[in-house]
Amino acid sequence: MEKNLLGYYGEQTALSFVRQEKGYHVRCCNYRNRLGEIDIIADDGHTLVFIEVKTRTTGSYGLPCEAVEKRKRRQITRVASAYLARFGLWERPCRFDVIEVWPGDNGQPGIRHIAHAFLAERR
């Protein structure tokens, strides 16, 4: 599967998962600013959830969540801070999650949701 198509598949799968399985209200998908991008911004009813989606077809490169290294966490934190500032949401509790997606053998995708996957990164 092409990298762009694989990423799209993963994000759409994660989006359906957070809406249907988790019952989250999705505020934004692929939120971009000059600092970077966040795949999904959702509200679980109490907390704003900034979600990074990682999709893999094989385990050759390790677990998908391992791709969310320090540099990526720092970038996500900066984009989230800018989002909170732009919409005046500083008072809202927030967390950073990772959703791993992989194509399943039976046509059903494999999904692993890692809530509180990391803390906000500073410099």
Set out the residue ranges of the language-model regions.
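Acidic-basic catalytic patches of nuclease active cores, encompassing PD-(D/E)XK
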Residues: 1-29
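Short acidic/glycine-enriched loop/turn segments that link adjacent beta-strands
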Residues: 3, 34-36, 107
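Residue-level signal for inorganic ion chemistry
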Residues: 18, 76, 96
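Short beta-strand or tight-loop elements
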Residues: 22, 34-38, 94
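Conserved catalytic cores of phosphodiester-cleaving nucleases, focusing on short active-site segments
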Residues: 38-59, 76
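Domain-level recognition of nuclease-like catalytic cores that cleave nucleotide substrates
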Residues: 86-123
